[in-house]
Amino acid sequence: MLLESDTQLNQKSYYEASVLRRAPEPALAGALSADVLVVGAGFAGLSAAIELAQQGLSVVVLEADRVCSGASGRNGGQAIVGFSSGQAPFEQQLGMSDARLAWDMTIEAIALIDERIARFGIECDRVAGYLYVADSARKARLLENDMKILQRDYGFASEFASGTDTQRLIGSQRYCAAAFEPVSGHLHPLKYGLALADAARSLGVRIFEHSAVQAIERGATLLARTAAGRVTAKFAVLAGNCTLREHGPHVAPEITPRIMPVGTYMVATAPLDPALCRRLIPSNASACDNNFILDYFRFSADHRMLFGGGVSYSTMTPRRLAQTMGARMCQVFPELKGVPLDYVWGGFVDISMNRAPDFGRLGDNLYYLQGFSGHGVALTGLAGRLVAQAVAGQAARFDVFARLQHRQFPGGVLFRTPSLVLGTLYHRLRDLL
């Protein structure tokens, strides 16, 4: 059901409509061998493949659908420093020294995007700048305090505005405070992801689409099986996230209960007057509020408002999605009332229980990357670099994340959704305050 809903939700994606995909890669047939097998051709898997190939290793990537057909190719396009969890899990579990190291690596994650754009000549509408916004006095105080802590403990500076001064940063009466920082930003995720695949191919990586991994036999040499083929490898990286279990429930059953698929949705308006765009977001930054149920938005290169928000813990496609998302958008920007919505889409992302990324090993040679929790545009690139370093025997930075403890969702895989819905109802009420 999840895979069917995911495909259905992505049929009217602005991103898919604004790129020209190459012909599909063939499905795996027969037997292959490689130094490293990567499962999943999203940002994390492709990033790992690039880094591994740059080390001179032979790499095979198996993708169950098409390159970046999942969360990597249809997200908000916001490349953000930090973690969805905030710094608390890192400070509490690892101490301030490693918490600072983890934070600094998220700065590196943004730089890595720009490094790859420059090296491989990627055109993906990259724009720098990010706005955090708050819609109540309580949340404005929280935002200001968070920014002060980042400045004090991590040396990360931002520009804070409140009251009427907020309008200088964002042209919406809904918000009473905003913080701008120039490091994060936004891009066209599918353009970026398809270009990463091209970069991987240029380095000799072999990519197979429509090649879901159904099982992996573990040992000193790993053996992965698909419907029509098999791959033997010295190492493997699992980067399928919330769809990994759907294709191969027995591939890694010990880690799949630690993440949960959550539906999130977006709309794209018809192209707007550039002057209106400058009035609504003068810096052309991407933006996100600090509610538990987020609204996030930005402008595309062709002057469309791309507005995302809402979550669903069901695999069913929500009814009246266009009307619901359009209403949310117009609550933020009433000027957009009556503007046509040319595209409406959505799909599933993975979240961890504590919203911190979940990286680790299953034995000595099977690695996994999951739990990006809405910060995947930047963190997936970092994850790929770290896991490649670990495969090469330089695991210190990977192990900063691997030492984080992650709990399973209450109720396990089958009954985790009702438990999370109950918790979310509380936070929905908090968002109103």
Range-by-range predicted roles:
Residues 1-36, 54:
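Extreme N-terminal leader/targeting segments of oxidoreductases
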Residues 2-18, 85-91, 115-129, 133-195:
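Flavin (FAD/FMN) cofactor-binding and adjacent substrate-gating region
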Residues 34-61:
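N-terminal Rossmann-like FAD-binding beta1-loop-alpha1 element of flavoenzymes
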Residues 54-74:
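Glycine-rich FAD pyrophosphate-binding loop
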Residues 74-104:
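Glycine-rich active-site loop/strand segments that organize a redox cofactor
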Residues 111, 119-127, 213, 221, ...:
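Active-site substrate-recognition segment that forms the wall
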Residues 148-149, 174-235:
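Helical element adjacent to the flavin cofactor pocket in flavoenzyme catalytic cores
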Residues 315-432:
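C-terminal catalytic lobe of FAD-dependent flavoproteins
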